[in-house]
Regions:
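Non-catalytic extracellular/periplasmic "stalk"
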Residues: 1-45, 49
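Catalytic cores of peptidoglycan-degrading enzymes
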Residues: 38-184, 191-198
Length: 198
């Protein structure tokens, strides 16, 4: 016959197991929120992709280190994941730029923006409006230039965005995004094509 003490012990062990499982699931959820998988511009068409292309300004072959999303000036730009704003400044190449550190050597970069709604040091959440589409810096038309860097090396942002879509399609998938989606691959060329925007 099971004693009350044994029942209490079993209940306590079950409680510990549940606490550990809940903690792990919560940790995985947080990690997913910190991986830049959300579209930075809603319903935007894709212009230039990541990879080698003919630079629209110089006419020479060059590596395009991100994705371009042509859009009307003033279109909202959202953070692709939560993190801390580490750069908010003007650069001759990128124009007005915002960079968000997501931890784990992951940074997302938003360039050529017009109005900026965050400042360096701000803690931001996934989907938060951080800027507006513009045409600043070395640009041939209004668009967002979006980059994802791993350990300072540009990677194809499309892999991250695809991982986000796959995650939405399979909500019970608890696997690590980086491990299953090839997110930390090399920055070799892809099928980039010449486009109007930089």
């Amino acid at each position: 016959q099971v004693t009350l003490r044994e029942l209490d012990s079993n209940a306590s062990q079950s409680s510990v197991v549940m606490t550990v499982l809940e903690s792990r699931l919560f940790e995985q959820k947080i990690k997913k929120m910190m991986v830049p998988t959300q579209m930075p511009v809603a319903n935007a068409n894709l212009g230039s992709v990541f990879g080698w292309r003919i630079d629209p300004i110089t006419g020479a072959s060059a590596l395009h280190t991100g994705l371009d999303f042509p859009a009307t000036p003033g279109t909202p730009i959202s953070a692709a994941a939560g993190g801390v704003v580490v750069t908010q400044e003007y650069q001759s190449e990128y124009g007005n730029i915002v960079e968000v550190d997501h931890g784990n050597d992951l940074i997302s970069r938003y360039a050529h923006v017009s109005k900026v709604h965050v400042k360096k040091g701000d803690l931001i959440k996934r989907g938060q409006k951080i800027a507006e589409v513009g045409n600043t810096g070395r640009s041939t038309g209004p668009h967002l230039h979006f980059e994802v860097l791993v350990q300072g090396v540009p990677q194809d942002p499309q892999k991250f965005l695809n991982a986000g879509r796959n995650l939405l399609a399979t909500p019970n998938n608890r696997t690590n995004l980086a491990a299953t989606s090839g997110l930390y691959g090399s920055n070799g060329g892809s099928n980039g094509t010449p486009q109007a925007q930089r």
